[in-house]
Design a protein with these regions (language model features):
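C-terminal substrate-binding/catalytic lobe of Rossmann-fold NAD(P)-dependent oxidoreductases
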Residues: 5, 14, 18, 25-78, ...
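N-terminal Rossmann-like NAD(P) cofactor-binding subdomain of oxidoreductases
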Residues: 2-198, 219, 327, 335-349
Length: 349
């Protein structure tokens, strides 16, 4: 079976390179084009920022970077038989470029925030609200993944909100440096300025995106901060519920969350519940199905959310969630979204 030709918007950022890593050997998708600022440069010559080596197939690739600002970009992509585009662009260029590609008939799956709250654009976490994936009449599909910090909150919350009325959500995040891009990882001055500081606009994004996905109306108390860790977002959460569940009742519900679709990036265990506090060193790559770690081949690695249920007392459910921010919370979530669209036969329409 021939693979679907796909392209990536963005070439050198961490999310773009996670996308490149995940698409290099993907069973359903074939990466044939990348658009960015370094037009004309061979993709293999772009500096690689991930800890894992660049996939060999990309090292030998003859892909040249297309001009991201070319008004004929859609035609350039169509000339390469591209059907789907993965966007790793910042919000401002995404707001200009993504809609043009959709209008030209290309399906766009975006990690950018620009269209997440647009009423005609799908905001989807593939294993939480797959039914929300839709295209406007006569249009190609335009779908967005969420803010990377949502995942360790959303997976437990999506399960519990089906059984309990949530009146208040209190969340405190500890977000890794990679969530702000590779420059923060390598610039000591920027790093010191960011650590332990509130992340502007982050809490507001978390609230509005969760409310849209779950149709949830609750009181919110959310604070976010950057911590001196390379990867992995940890969130401490308290849910105030209008019921009196027991610890065992909540634990049973969290453990009942199962795989929803048989997709290449979908881990067998969507949410691993553990008794100890989640650790980046031990649990960051949960979902991993082969050793040694090779996320180019093992698309499930880093896709499982890790949760410790701390307590259930007086109608307050306390838990800690951990997810890999550049994989599950970004590139992996976007690719999973495209896999869902493939399964739903959008690419055949």
């Amino acid at each position: 079976m021939s693979r679907v030709h796909v392209a990536i918007l963005g070439a050198s950022g961490l999310v773009s390179q996670r996308m490149q890593q995940r698409l290099a050997m993907h069973p359903w998708f074939e990466l044939v084009a990348v658009a960015g600022q370094s037009q004309g440069t061979n993709l293999a010559d772009i500096e690689w920022h991930l800890d894992e080596p660049r996939p060999e197939v990309l090292d030998s690739s003859e892909i040249k970077i297309l001009d991201i600002n070319d008004r004929n970009l859609a035609e350039e992509l169509k000339n390469r038989n591209v059907i789907a585009v993965f966007s790793a662009l910042p919000s401002e260029p995404a707001s200009r470029i993504e809609a043009n590609l959709v209008s030209a008939g290309l399906h766009v799956f975006s990690n950018a925030s620009a269209f997440r709250m647009h009423p005609e654009v799908s905001l989807v976490v593939a294993d939480v609200n797959p039914e929300a994936l839709h295209a406007s009449s006569g249009q190609a599909l335009h779908a967005c993944a969420t803010n990377c910090t949502l995942v360790p909150i959303l997976h437990p919350l999506s399960v519990l909100s089906q059984h309990y009325t949530i009146s208040k959500v209190v969340a405190r995040s500890e977000q890794a440096l990679s969530g702000a891009g590779w420059k923060l990882l390598h610039n000591q001055e920027l790093k010191m300025q960011a650590i332990d500081q509130e992340i502007p606009g982050e809490a507001e994004k978390i609230v509005e995106e969760i409310e849209r996905i779950l149709d949830l109306s609750a009181e919110w108390d959310v604070q976010t901060k950057r911590v001196e860790e390379r990867d992995g977002h940890i969130v401490h959460v308290e849910l105030h519920v209008d019921n009196t569940p027991t610890f065992d009742m909540v634990a049973s519900l969290l453990q009942s969350k199962k795989q929803t679709h048989a997709l290449p990036s979908q881990p067998t265990c969507l949410m691993e519940c553990i008794q100890s506090e989640p650790s980046r060193e031990e649990h960051l790559w949960n979902g991993q199905s082969m050793n040694p770690l090779n996320p180019t081949v093992d698309l499930k690695a880093g896709m499982t959310t890790t949760v410790q249920l701390k307590s259930v007392e007086n109608g307050v459910v306390s838990f800690i969630g951990l997810s890999h921010n550049t994989i599950r919370g970004a590139a992996g979530g976007v690719v999973l979204l495209a896999e869902l669209a493939y399964l739903k036969k959008y690419f055949e329409q």
